Amino acid sequence: MFATKTVLFIAVVSLLGTFSSAAVDTFIYGGCSQEKYFPGSPYESNVNSLLTSFVSSASLYTYNNFTTNGISGDSSSVYGLYQCRGDLSSGSGDCARCVARAVSRLGSLCAMASGGALQLEGCFVKYDNTTFLGVEDKTVVVRRCGPPVGYNSDEMTRRDSVVGSLAASSGGSYRVGVSGELQGVAQCTGDLSATECQDCLMEAIGRLRTDCGGAAWGDVYLAKCYARYSARGGHSRANGYGGNRNNNDDDEIEKTLAIIVGLIAGVTLLVVFLSFMAKSCERGKGGK
């Protein structure tokens, strides 16, 4: 995932909703370096400064990268970038809200880690102690495919049309394709050149075709780009991508909350009962 010597642990992946309607702060993936920094160190100060710059800049720009230099000769320099999905704007505040959420989650996920990256539905943030800016990285981070749809010539034609439009080199760094009920989206990070972006996207799209060609939907995230396709509003990917899994999870959450509330109520009643019994005993002793 990182183009550095650090080793990353990819956090639990949970892709939810379709790209057009899912909440922009839906968690996609996150990873942190094994290497840690010391609390109170100059590097920690530079990381905090960098992440703060992300949030401030996102109210004006949908992409930016920063280098926070340390003192000459030390190892406290930190490099980072953020990027919002191509259909989000800085003017509406959607980009800034997403980046702020991503920075907050990254701070919790990668506390004291020298490097970290986090992808939400609407934005991506990354920092490291070794520069990765302008470096193409086609490492596979996430690859998920939906259930097979079986042979359907119309469906396959639409899918090929959508994926083909994503592969068009004239599409820029953010690309959208639509055919019937199918839609696709692809994007690479803003630090790549046009040639590097096309190369990265072709790798992601190629994997999407090969690995998810007969699936109802598919997602391939590489370290510096991604490509996805899905039926518009036709499925939910919560916790394993099953169409009804989200409702089941909500039911489980409600059941858990009901149990917790019941336990709290039971404990409260027990405390009241014991208090009443204790007072009754005291009155009984006082009357003797």
From Swiss-Prot:
Transmembrane spans: 257-277
UniProt KW keywords: Cell junction, Cell membrane, Disulfide bond, Host-virus interaction, Membrane, Repeat, Signal, Transmembrane, Transmembrane helix, Transport
Pfam families: Stress-antifung
The organism's place on the tree of life at top rank: Eukaryota
Signal peptide interval: 1-22
Main location: membrane
Tissue: Highly expressed in inflorescence silique (at mRNA level).
Sequence ranges on the Cytoplasmic membrane side: 278-288
Region span, Necessary and sufficient for plasmodesmal targeting: 257-277
Keyword Electron transport on entry: no
GO cellular component, one term: plasmodesma
Residues in Gnk2-homologous domain copies: 25-132, 137-234
Intracellular or extracellular location(s): Cell membrane; Cell junction, Plasmodesma
Extracellular face residues: 23-256
Residue pairs linked by disulfide bridges in the UniProt entry: 32-110, 84-95, 98-123, 145-212, 188-197, 200-225
Membrane topology: Single-pass type I membrane protein
Function as written in the Swiss-Prot or TrEMBL entry: Modulates cell-to-cell trafficking.
Alphabetical list of PANTHER family matching this protein: ANTIFUNGAL PROTEIN GINKBILOBIN-2-LIKE (PTHR32080), PLASMODESMATA-LOCATED PROTEIN 6 (PTHR32080:SF31)
Quaternary state and interactors: (Microbial infection) Interacts with Grapevine fanleaf virus (GFLV) 2B-MP.
Similarity field: Belongs to the cysteine-rich repeat secretory protein family. Plasmodesmata-located proteins (PDLD) subfamily.
Protein's recorded name: Plasmodesmata-located protein 6
Organism: Arabidopsis thaliana
